Each structure stands twice: as structure tokens, then as C-alpha cells.
Amino acid sequence: MGSHCSKNRSCRNYVTPTQKSNVREILKREHEHIMQGIVAFSCNISLENKNMKKNRYPDAPCFDYNRVVLPIRKGLDDYINASYVDGHNMKRRFICTQGPLEETALDFWQAVYQDRVRVIVMITKTYEDNKQKCYPYWMTHERSTVTYGELKIRTKKIKSFRNYKVTTLCLTNTNTGTVLDIKHFAYEDWPQGGVPSDVNNFLDFVLAVRHADSKTEVPISSESRVKESPILVHSSAGLDRAPAFCVIDICISKYSESAIIPLLTTVRDLRRQRNNCLSLSTQYIFCYFTVLQFVMSTPC
């Protein structure tokens, strides 16, 4: 929704309670329009027989052109169901991926290591309705360690907030001695196929991630505007909740620069980068009202 909100007007009166139902209908129609668009990029690598078992869901392949390509390792190929996603005026701000399977946890950490990821965002529970949605790829107790190949991941500190947890991890490549300090943000109050009950809580989570990312001392290439340490975002399938986080982050950045909430164009662009993502109108609407809450809480 390309909705203008001048910084000189009262943002708190931008959408009144009586207007919300009308806005929801507009957003629903916008989403229907987006879903009618055809995104014709190949997914051949994802659909190869040898790689299908690495996809958590068989109907969720990733595009070939922007997939994360892992280094060839002994006995392993270069495939992971993960996509590079652009941010606002920034190439590859995100890696958007599925929740790891047990057999792809090593691939997950290889992607973290090769792209020097410093912030991981997890928007799923490990189990929901007695089904595994994400393999627990890190240790949930302080001073505990798990090893995948040459990569050792130590849990240093866990801090709990009202609606999310932040875990400080230390990743060490035992072959090279390279060490990465990583912040792992876990938000578990967004059910698969639904939306959180409170936009304020999720907005707090998004802003906490943005603050942590801003503190990482990793440069952006001035020529290509490529982020050299992308934020890795995952849910279970990596198709709705994880892309929704990306959309909200992008819209916040765009609003901060130009005072508009360009939801439609942002989602349309993101669907060209992560296959079949953001297919639910309820989540599209949630993205808008989360960004709107940011607008309302920002001095005009």
C-alpha cells in the first residue's frame, strides 16, 4: 500500500479505529492483485532429485538466480534452500531460508560462516502441534557447545525478553581459527499460518534486531551496496513469516527516508526473490499495521 504520511501532519491520526476496516479491505484487494502476478524464474536446482530431500516442504523450492551457493565440501554439494534478499538501497541485506532439518543443519551453519552472518532471526517454534518446524541447530543452555563438521557453536549467554529471546553465540572454525560472534533472536509468538496478536510486540522485536545489526562492524561495499554480513532470517518454510520480517524492515527504512509505506511494491519485489512467499492476506495486512505502528510512534 503506497500510503503517504507526511512528517508534518499528525501521524497519530493517520488511521483512526473507524478507518481500519476500510484499510483492511483495501489491503486485501491489493494482496489479491499481487497474487495474480506471475513470477517466472527457474527453480531447477531445488527440484533436482538429490536436493528435494533438503527442502523442508516439497512445494517450496527457491529460485536459481539468487540462491545461496555453498562451497563444495567432501561428500556434500552446494545446495541449501536459502535466498539472498535485497533491503532498502542495499543488496543482499538478508538471507531468507527455511528452518533447518537435522540433515541440513551443517549446511545452515556453512551458510552462516561463508557469509559472515552476525545476526540470526528465527520466527518459529522448533515444534508446533507436535510437529517439528525447525531442527534445534544450536544449544539452548549457556556454556554448552554443538559441533557441525569443522564449525563449533558455543552458547555464551541467553537473555529473555517479554516476547523473544536473544542468545549470544560464538562460532569457531576449528580448521582456520576464525571466530564469529553472533546474536540469535528468537520470536516464537507468530504461529504458522497466522499472525501475532500484538503488532507492538513484534515491532519491538524488529527494532531490537535492527539495533543489533547496526552495531555489527561489518562494512557495506560502497560501489555495489552489497551488505557483506547479511541478516539471516528463517521461519519454518521461509515463505511467510521470514519474508514478512524482511518486508517490515524494508518499509521502516523506506518510511524513515521518504515518509511513505510502500507495502505493495516491497512485497512484489520480495516475491521476485523468494518463491511463493507472502501468500496470506492476513500477513500482508499485519505487515502494514506493524509499520504503521512504527509511524505512529515516530515523532512527526
From Swiss-Prot:
PROSITE patterns: TYR_PHOSPHATASE_2, TYR_PHOSPHATASE_PTP. InterPro entries: Prot-tyrosine_phosphatase-like (IPR029021), Protein-Tyr_Phosphatase (IPR050348), PTP_cat (IPR000242), Tyr_Pase_cat (IPR003595), Tyr_Pase_dom (IPR000387). Residues 27-294 form the Tyrosine-protein phosphatase domain. GO terms for molecular function: protein tyrosine phosphatase activity. SMART domains: PTPc, PTPc_motif. Belongs to the protein-tyrosine phosphatase family. This is Tyrosine phosphatase-like protein J1. It comes from Microplitis demolitor bracovirus (isolate Webb) (MdBV).
